[in-house]
Amino acid sequence: MKKITLIGSELAKTGNEFIYLGPLEECEPCRFKRICHNNLEVGTRYKIVSVRSANHPCTVHENGVKVVEVMPAEFTIIIESKKALEGVTLTHSDIHCDRVCCENYLACHPEGISGKYRVSSILPEKVECKKGNSLKKISIVPVQQ
């Protein structure tokens, strides 16, 4: 489902993704606060699907903000093989691992996942785990609640 929000003009490009972190103190007195923040969920990754041309003033973004349509982004993560079933709905939990230099670490500990998500596809790529875990790379989409 598409949502309307505002984002810094420099960042407002179709296809860009961002993780919504919540309002800043500077946002409190702004007349656009509701449009910027009420439609988004903290910790969720969004993809910009369209950008409108009008520019609006903003105390946070130097070059103002633009109205954009966003939707929760589909993205790739790594999970335990036993949980990797196409179409299933899961709540994400990071894989227990302290090897931050591992090439898979960021995919095993992704940012921007909050709440439940649906496994949209299981990718054929082989995932090598130095700790011996059986892992799969999957594409996910957030489940709207």
From Swiss-Prot:
Similarity remark: Belongs to the UPF0179 family.
PANTHER family: UPF0179 PROTEIN MJ1627
Name of this protein: UPF0179 protein MmarC5_1728
Protein species of origin: Methanococcus maripaludis (strain C5 / ATCC BAA-1333)
UniProt xrefs under InterPro entries: UPF0179 (IPR005369)
HAMAP family per record: UPF0179
Lineage of source species: Archaea, Methanobacteriati, Methanobacteriota, Methanomada group, Methanococci
Domain of life: Archaea
Disulfide bridges in this chain: none
Name of a matching Pfam family: UPF0179
